């Protein structure tokens, strides 16, 4: 008999049956940070990148990835996402800038959207890197985390390293 939720009694992987869970309004917000050089920051703001503005492309990539999360993560349930929104902001840091990518995903369903939010910011960061690598291959994608989640049986979660967001 298996003691793990994602393995059957024969010890093989399985997708958990969520049909008995109640459908509730659920939201998840994730964040990913990309450290960039002053040179890249200037190129973006001067609109001199050969591939064009990386942010709209990264935004679309994040939305598309959120919708495809179940195809990327084996035990993730395919769900009908009701909304995905991404945000981008630059913060000055020592030796450059930090691009902070945020994603909020919403659903009325019987499973959460944490993985969808995390997948959205990760795909957006990878797309940003792809759009900008001709100028700066030394970018660092770092600190991907779940900022908050609301709804569901276990209630709300707020990452202890981020302020409570309302």
Curated annotation (Swiss-Prot):
Role this protein plays: Catalyzes the conversion of (8S)-3',8-cyclo-7,8-dihydroguanosine 5'-triphosphate to cyclic pyranopterin monophosphate (cPMP).
Name of the encoding gene: moaC
Entry superkingdom: Bacteria
Family the entry assigns: Belongs to the MoaC family.
The keyword Lyase appears for this protein: yes
Organism phylogeny: Bacteria, Bacillati, Bacillota, Bacilli, Bacillales
Organism of this sequence: Shouchella clausii (strain KSM-K16) (Alkalihalobacillus clausii)
Subunit structure: Homohexamer; trimer of dimers.
Record GO biological process: Mo-molybdopterin cofactor biosynthetic process
NCBIfam families registered for this protein in UniProt: moaC (TIGR00581), PRK09364.1 (NF006870)
Name of the featured protein: Cyclic pyranopterin monophosphate synthase
